[in-house]
Amino acid sequence: MTSTTLRVKTAGFFKFEGVQFGTIATLVFKELRDAIRNRWLALYAFAFAGLALALSWTAMSGLGGYGLAGFSRTAAALINLVLLIVPLMGLTLGAMALAGERERGSLAYLLAQPVTIAEVMIGKFIGLGLTLAAALAFGFGLSGVVIAWRGSSASGGDYLELVGLTLLLGLATLSIGFLISAGSRKGATAIGIALFAWLGLAFISDLGLMGTAVVLDIEINTLFTLSLLNPLQVFKMAAVLS
């Protein structure tokens, strides 16, 4: 077995090309502990849950009045909410993953320990990904329980599909936030770039594609391919098709 293949160390940890999964697990738990003290994450989670409940209340249930809509109707109403809130969550969480610790000096202290940059990146991404998933599960779960109690659960599969697509969107924007954080020296700079990226992905990209298509007379297939570069567009198309 070569040094680049999967092997077991005497300490019991797996190692693949210099990456120790025991170290990664430690870093993941560290990120989860830090997330518990993150007030912004709690604010995102409660805001998302509150807005989801508000949408489910105001959506028409087809019963002749206001009420908590069923899963299918509410899932359709939540698409626009997800397109606004979830990318902002992923981008800002990712933007502060490295830049904030670099500015405070804690990243240099962490890298002075017997860890590699790859282990730090993987551990932080998994930890923040689980944190983001927990926040989304809280919002969707609270809304889903109340909707199922007062509404109809016949189309619960549509709701679960939306939850899965939302998680993928959150992880995609979290990755973009990580790239922003890796290239920023200060947390404020990373947050500013993340906000501009959010505005570009959520609002400007549609106008840019339409303007480019008109000016350059782009074919529909090329325009469709360009739209797939935006994770929000991919989510929107997948959600509509589902």
Predicted stretch roles:
Residues 167-216:
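A structural motif at transmembrane helix-loop-helix junctions in multipass membrane proteins
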Residues 97-129:
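Helix-loop-helix units of permease transmembrane domains in multi-pass membrane transporters
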Residues 3, 62, 203-242:
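Terminal transmembrane helical anchor/hairpin motif
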Residues 25-35, 67-71, 116-119:
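Cytosolic juxtamembrane amphipathic/interface segments immediately preceding
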Residues 54-57, 64, 68, 74-75, ...:
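Secretory targeting signals
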Residues 2-45:
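Aromatic- and glycine-rich beta-strand/loop motifs that create alpha-glucan
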Residues 87-94, 142, 175-176, 205, ...:
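Hydrophobic/aromatic residues in alpha-helical transmembrane segments
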Residues 77-100:
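Long, hydrophobic alpha-helical segments
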